[in-house]
Design a protein with these regions (language model features):
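TPR alpha-solenoid repeat register
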Residues: 56, 93, 126-127, 165, ...
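Internal metal/ion-chelating core segments
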Residues: 149-245
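Short coil turns that delineate tetratricopeptide repeat
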Residues: 18, 51-52, 87-88, 122-123, ...
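Alpha-helical repeat scaffolds
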Residues: 9, 38-47, 72-86, 107-119, ...
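Inter-helical turn/loop elements of alpha-helical hairpins
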Residues: 2-3, 8, 14-22, 27-52, ...
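Long, hydrophobic, well-ordered secondary-structure blocks that form the structural core
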Residues: 128, 133-139, 200, 204-208
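Asp-box/WD-like beta-propeller blade repeats and closely related beta-sheet repeat scaffolds
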Residues: 111-115, 121-134
Length: 247
């Protein structure tokens, strides 16, 4: 039996999936959202298993392009070319437009197009993650900060992934030199869940910016099982070395 999973994640770009496909897609998506190391392999398996599905291809192309490996752009391009336009819905078409610009290397257009998707659906955590991280690569400005302030108003602690929004908004505040607010939001996010590495990253950024070597959540940080995570963990380790350096 087919069912939509968009009501769970507020997505309207996900294909109708059976129970197994729905579980596998959510697993792959969560792997990316939480910086797990197996997101690419899980998305690849989904595409290989059912090439007719569009959402797994959107996820896989995004993961390939997020690697910033120019040698792999052709792989994303081939996936894009394999999609039949008459089989997609309106929001999928918008995502594919984002990916087309991304493949072309036009990150400014990518960010603007993703922002338009978010305006239509401010609870699409996948689009928000893509907006947040691609914005970093083109340079953060007041628009980045303003977008996060507008977004967080549309979320509540009853929403799935609310702590992720807190972590990203914390980073936006930190980059806007408001370290007190950045700390409060990162701490609130980690009080909800210790699973988001980006919330840890935001907290570490605050400490780095203030040259503060006393991480108040050190015990919880030391409990992170790094075996689950991909390259992001190395970036956090780099921040951790700054602690040792300043000590």
């Amino acid at each position: 039996m087919k069912r939509k999973i968009d009501n769970l994640y507020n997505f309207n770009w996900v294909d109708s999936l059976d129970k197994v496909e729905g579980f596998e897609f959510k697993e792959a998506l969560n792997s990316y959202i939480f910086f797990k190391k197996d997101s690419l392999s899980l998305a690849t398996k989904l595409v290989d298993k059912n090439p007719k599905l569009i959402a797994p291809k959107i996820l896989l192309m995004s993961l390939i392009l997020l690697s910033r490996d120019r040698k792999k752009i052709v792989i994303a391009k081939n996936i894009l070319n394999s999609i039949k336009i008459d089989s997609i819905n309106e929001i999928q078409e918008k995502y594919l437009s984002v990916l087309k610009k991304w493949i072309e290397g036009d990150l400014y257009s990518v960010v603007e197009k993703i922002k338009n998707i978010i305006i239509e659906n401010p609870k699409d955590i996948f689009a928000i993650r893509l907006f947040h991280f691609n914005s970093i690569f083109i340079g953060l400005d007041k628009k980045f900060f303003k977008t996060h302030l507008e977004l967080i108003k549309k979320w509540s602690d009853k929403d799935d992934f609310y702590n992720l929004i807190l972590g990203m908004t914390s980073f936006a505040y930190e980059e806007n030199n408001d370290y007190s607010k950045a700390y409060d939001l990162a701490k609130l996010s980690l009080d909800i869940s210790k699973d988001d590495l980006w919330s840890w990253h935001a907290l570490l950024h605050v400490h780095d910016s203030k040259v503060d070597c006393t991480l108040k959540l050190q015990n919880e940080y030391n409990k992170i099982n790094w075996n689950f995570y991909g390259p992001m963990k190395r970036h956090l380790w780099w921040h951790q070395t700054l602690f040792f350096y300043y000590q």
